[in-house]
Amino acid sequence: MSEYSLFTSESVSEGHPDKIADQISDAVLDAIIAEDKYARVACETLVKTGVAIIAGEVSTSAWVDLEDIVRNVILDIGYNSSDVGFDGATCGVMNIIGKQSVDIAQGVDRSKPEDQGAGDQGLMFGYASNETDVLMPAPITFSHQLVQRQAEARKSGLLPWLRPDAKSQVTCRYENGKVVGVDAIVLSTQHNPDVSYKDLREGVMELIVKHVIPAHLLHKDTQFHINPTGNFIIGGPVGDCGLTGRKIIVDTYGGMARHGGGAFSGKDPSKVDRSAAYAGRYVAKNIVAAGLAERCEIQVSYAIGVAQPTSISLNTFGTGKLSDDKIIKLVRDNFDLRPYAITTMLDLLHPMYQATAAYGHFGRTPVEMTVGDDTFTAFTWEKTDRADALRAAAGL
């Protein structure tokens, strides 16, 4: 971070139209993978006034009630009345999901599971830094926490005039690679028409902003932009069309690290867009947790139908205790980054994905979940269980 003095990241709430789409896509994936863990799923969603459309390609033996899944996601988010502009109980649901191409299947599937080829070509990045306790960049971490708190305040009734759609943005000031202050906070939240701007600003400042941002990072010149346009009554899919995969920077590192371009939601773990990005985070986080570097960005690339990565590269931005080449060797010795090996290493064949589809895929806490008879750990890529082995192998 030493190359920046200011850095800004944004996040959006679970009620943002693009995030509604992401959550629907991942809810469909979860429902299918709960019945058929080896299913191939690529589900895209579009939401707009009064309608949700799901499309994509699936190869599975499972049957799931897709319309019911879509409606439940929308209702659970809080779009349950025409008063808020969208109602999961009455909106139209269109399903145009088809079968996966046999050409893709023959390139991916193998008689030996460990030889499974990548589902597509592409490049993926993983990143970690020691500037927060979750080893994530501070601007995106604070941005996620603001919209998470907005949802908590809305759902608990703490601020009952809040509605589901919201966006946040945080600008952090850095000195010598460390966060020393927050220079600007933007929080725009949908609300009902009866609340005054004065009450809205006071409630958001006291019960959301000050609850999230550490007081020692705020200063006399910190800018607070709370609903800067004044009113935000019309929101959600009425205000904007929502699509799966349009918040890839929100989903990852808030722009602090590079991005290969592939979205996550709606894709089963055979798609390296998702699984290899999770593996990249796992590798980078363990490198930083081991004390091998203060910051680490790793790139992995694949060819469709080929198991072994076509490249692995790494950058510690001058913060490494070892050379980057030596750390890459440690990565190759300690992590198998073939697609099937990633799925096994991170235990990805479980219905865990809807939980990832809002408030970021990274910087989360591994949590035990139970779906039906299946008990598993979600967010396994956030574990630091390889740090000790890496530290020992590095001789630190």
UniProtKB/Swiss-Prot annotation:
Region (Flexible loop): 100-110
Entry keyword annotation includes Transferase: yes
Keyword hit for Metal-binding: yes
Cofactor: binding details: Binds 2 divalent ions per subunit.
Main enzyme class: transferase
Binding-site positions, ATP: 16, 165-167, 240, 246-247, 263, 267
Protein name stated in the entry: S-adenosylmethionine synthase
Species in which this protein is naturally found: Pseudomonas syringae pv. tomato (strain ATCC BAA-871 / DC3000)
